[in-house]
Amino acid sequence: MTQKKVAILGAGSWGTGLALVLADNNHKPVIWGNLDKIVNEINESHTNSHYLPDIILPTEVKATLSLDEAIDGAEIVVIAIPTNAMRVVCKQLNEALKEPTILVHVSKGIEPETNLRMSEVIEEEVDATKRKALVVLSGPSHAEEVALRHPTTLCASCKDLKAAEIVQDRFINNNLRIYTNDDVIGAEIGGALKNIIALGAGISDGLGYGDNAKAALMTRGMAEITRLGVAVGSNPQTFYGLTGIGDLIVTCTSVHSRNWRAGNMLGKGENLDEVLEKMGMVVEGVRTAKAVHGWAKKLDIDMPITESIYAILFENKDAREAVDLLMGRKKKIEKESF
């Protein structure tokens, strides 16, 4: 395979993990970061100890503080940043791009102010003439396990399946299997909304409830995700795949999951401000819960679990009381509530 340069915007755990994969595949990953300390550590020590402790990076992984340097000559630009920074970074990217480039994003969330998915935010901020294609790379994955080269599967979703296949070819190897899909909306809805349900799974575990409760929460949570997804144009089958149920399972059941850990602390009685301070990293489900709360009402979509989690986060609702209210809802036929 011909060696290709790939720029990665974001020096966090996911951006760094993907850079490791690209280096393993004999490509030239260049990470753009905004902190001297992290950029220097990647270049000099070949580690990123804050985000991926104990991982030694291939020497081919490089980092820079210069966006122009990172994207110069890159076949693909991967955007691996928190959703709250997406607009700002994409404005910078739009100014810096000199020719049409394949853009890939791995950020999972909804913009609260607009209810826009991340690909829609990118499309607003990066001129169409500078976007050769826009691909969503998503699925059941923790950066820590990708960096350890544990078996992982993802899905590259794009309306242009040829572009999705290019991304597939750059990242696929014996440790990371990539599928392709043309349902961008479904991939983004599944990836974003599962973070809300993962908060709920953590809350359930923090309250001391068992596997029964979490299994029910995940299953009924997926019903809510599917209802909203179909309402905005997703293929319902997408939610049975990697970017749907796959991503939900890994995020609701793993100690690597920031959303599960945050929910677990909430379930044990800590308030949201305390939890976010202790986490020290972005918890996307909190921001997404705020967005989906208003979005579901606007679309008249029934999402009782999501609404309960919103109430716990932002209205100081007692978690046990929220569970009691969910369990006491009007009886239904299961098939009618999907």
Curated annotation (Swiss-Prot):
It holds the Pfam family NAD_Gly3P_dh_N. Its EC number is 1.1.1.94. PROSITE patterns: NAD_G3PDH (PS00957). It is found in: Cytoplasm. Pathway: Membrane lipid metabolism; glycerophospholipid metabolism. It catalyses: sn-glycerol 3-phosphate + NAD(+) = dihydroxyacetone phosphate + NADH + H(+); sn-glycerol 3-phosphate + NADP(+) = dihydroxyacetone phosphate + NADPH + H(+). InterPro entries: 6-PGluconate_DH-like_C_sf, 6PGD_dom2, G3P_DH_NAD-dep, G3P_DH_NAD-dep_C, G3P_DH_NAD-dep_N, NAD(P)-bd_dom_sf. The active site is at 194 (proton acceptor). Gene3D superfamilies: N-(1-d-carboxylethyl)-l-norvaline Dehydrogenase, domain 2, NAD(P)-binding Rossmann-like Domain. Signal peptide: none annotated. Sn-glycerol 3-phosphate binds at residues 108, 139, 141, 194, 247, 257-259. NADPH binds at residues 13-14, 108, 143, 258, 282, 284. GO terms for molecular function: glycerol-3-phosphate dehydrogenase [NAD(P)+] activity; NAD binding. GO terms for cellular component: cytosol. It comes from the Bacteria. GO terms for biological process: carbohydrate metabolic process; glycerol-3-phosphate biosynthetic process; glycerol-3-phosphate catabolic process; glycerophospholipid metabolic process; phospholipid biosynthetic process. NCBIfam families: PRK00094.1-2, PRK00094.1-3, PRK00094.1-4. Catalyzes the reduction of the glycolytic intermediate dihydroxyacetone phosphate (DHAP) to sn-glycerol 3-phosphate (G3P), the key precursor for phospholipid synthesis. PANTHER family: GLYCEROL-3-PHOSPHATE DEHYDROGENASE, GLYCEROL-3-PHOSPHATE DEHYDROGENASE [NAD(+)] 2, CHLOROPLASTIC. This is Glycerol-3-phosphate dehydrogenase [NAD(P)+]. The gene is gpsA.
